[in-house]
Amino acid sequence: MSTSIARGGWSDLTPSGRALFDAVLLDRDGTLIEDVPYNGDPEKVRPVPGAREALDRLRAAGLRLAVVTNQSGLARGCFTERQLRAVHARVEELLGPFDDWQVCPHDDADGCACRKPAPGLVHAAARALGTTPTRCALVGDIGRDMTAALAAGATGILVPTPVTRPEEVAEAPTVARDLPAAVDEILRRMRAVRPVAPRAGRAGTVLVVRSDSAGDVLVTGPGIRAVAAGADRVVLLCGPRGRVAAELLPGIDEIIEWPLPWIDSNPEPVDPQDMRRLTTRLAAVAADEAVIFTSFHQSPLPLALLLRMAGVPRISAISDDYPGSLLDTRHRVPTGIPEPERALSLAAAAGYTLAPDDEPGLRLRDSPVPTGAGADTAPENPVAGLPDDYVVVHPGSSVPARACPAGRCAQIVAALVADGRRVVVTGGPDERDLTARVAAAGGIDLGGATDLAGLVRVIAGARCLVVGNTGPAHLAAAVGTPVVSLFAPTVPFGQWGPYRVPTVRLGDAGAPCRGTRAAVCPVAGHPCLAGVEPAEVVAAVRLLAPPD
């Protein structure tokens, strides 16, 4: 267990649904102060440049601060607890007070649950500060810090130093050049999801748009809920691939399904008559305004033109391109921020924010979350008959470049079974051959046996989900199931990884396909995911879902 040095005064503070973060957790050596190995001498404490000013900005923003630090020098006899307290007193003398200190006094051989990369210190600090890990940002200088943050569900920001390995930089969800820049990032992201000025009153009917895959619709959920919190009626325009996900989202009163040829991955030729029918259908909504949600590589302007022709008086969207008179609110965001926050920032720019009791994570409408694997034995319940304690492996993906090779997935299933895990393999109706192959080593094959709502129930009942960058990863985030993310680096992990849920990222983050947005792997052998060792997955599952 960790050693906690906590201050009182936070018992009356509860998490607010209007803010992204309640607290910032900071590594000590290399992040707050210069790294002096096994230091027990207060006179050797040297803050990193700009540390005091950066921390004071966090304090001024109302954020609680805690230090989470591995100090194996205690276990090794390099310094005493008294010397450690003296060092920490000097840190506070130079940098100001911290609301909590969480110290792991063990070394790696002890096998404790607190030493980073384990998430124990993060959980302990969040509890001491009266919040949860998902409402914390963690700033550190090495991969252990980022792994601990992700495994707890916190937001990780890496500040590299000369000792940070290149692969740790590549794997980090967010990288800042120094501590002040990390603070800039935290405060910017907090400001981005808050409206500059509150709306004068509730909106009437608002048309929201998110046309793409099921996963894209799911990560837009927080933005849609923000609009719904300030509108009398919300109508969603989505494409055929996103319809099933849209039906699971709260805050939507009506769904219009219509493929958009400038968005769909396999578009039909533009049909003028179809565009006229769409314009007529949009006019029939009689929307008071529209909010067009898109991904960073998509343009809202073609649809904005149709909406103007349909008589929509106010339109908001993210657009780097000059919109002319097509947009009333032209919003811009930097690349790399998580997609749910991107959607929330657009909603905020349009004047909407989440309800005070609503968290900014992913959420489903009336999510069919079982209370136990045997809680509902109805035949239509896909969880009925499954073991009481299982791990899900989902090998498929709508984008081939993001899928772990089937042979490797089969080896992963075999390794998990050998570790004593009960494994359920899931997939769509067109993936039955894939799931049968992957499950052959001892898994339970549910390929093609569930619709999306059924898949939600299976994932919600699992201890952990092993999956690539595809829709089920976002379903897991929405129901709180930890994720072992086999993440191909074709798109940024910090933008598209599982959001605010305990996660371990695996795969070669520096592979040649990095940042290509390739749909089909451009590198022979798919090395970014084919190189994931089954033992790595077993260890990741153990970290996220320790055996009973």
Residue spans for each PLM region:
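Conserved Lys-Pro-Asp/Glu-containing loop-to-beta segment of HAD-superfamily phosphomonoesterases
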Residues: 113-149, 287-293, 459-467
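Structural recognition of alpha->loop->beta junctions
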Residues: 87-103, 167-187, 250-259, 439-444
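Active-site neighborhood of HAD-like aspartate-dependent phosphohydrolases
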Residues: 4-66
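Catalytic machinery of carbohydrate-active enzymes
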Residues: 69, 192-548
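Short, solvent-exposed loop/turn segments at secondary-structure boundaries
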Residues: 43-44, 77-82, 112-116, 267-270, ...
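Substrate-recognition element of Asp-dependent hydrolases with the DxDx(T/V) motif
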Residues: 51-88, 97-110, 149, 425-426
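Acidic, Mg2+-coordinating phosphoryl-transfer loop and its flanking beta/alpha structural elements
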Residues: 137-174, 483-487
